[in-house]
Swiss-Prot record:
The protein, known as: Large ribosomal subunit protein bL28
Region entry Disordered, spans: 1-26
Family membership noted in the UniProt record: Belongs to the bacterial ribosomal protein bL28 family.
Entry superkingdom: Bacteria
HAMAP family according to UniProt: Ribosomal_bL28
Pfam families: Ribosomal_L28
InterPro entries recorded: Bacterial_rp_bL28 (IPR050096), Ribosomal_bL28 (IPR026569), Ribosomal_bL28/bL31-like_sf (IPR034704), Ribosomal_bL28_bact-type (IPR001383), Ribosomal_bL28_sf (IPR037147)
GO biological process, one term: translation
A Gene Ontology cellular-component term: ribosome
Start-end of Polar residues biased regions: 11-22
An MF annotation (GO) of this entry: structural constituent of ribosome
């Protein structure tokens, strides 16, 4: 399963770490994924993985069970 936000589609970013000598090493910035139970418009409940930022938005919209 891909490390991807189920609602927004966000995934990890890639880039380089730079030391003091400016040596480049590839690295990834992963999402802070959380499992959460969500209720849709029909009232059915299901589990999805969302990022912490999306989780804050869902809590604000009161969509979390």
């Amino acid at each position: 399963m891909a490390r991807r936000d189920a609602l927004t589609g966000k995934s990890a970013l890639s880039g380089q770490s730079r030391s003091h000598a400016l040596n480049a090493t590839k690295r990834k910035w992963n999402l802070n994924l959380q499992k959460v139970r969500v209720m849709n418009e029909n009232g059915s409940v299901f589990n999805i993985k969302v990022s912490a930022r999306t989780l804050r938005t869902l809590k604000k919209q009161e969509k979390i069970v």
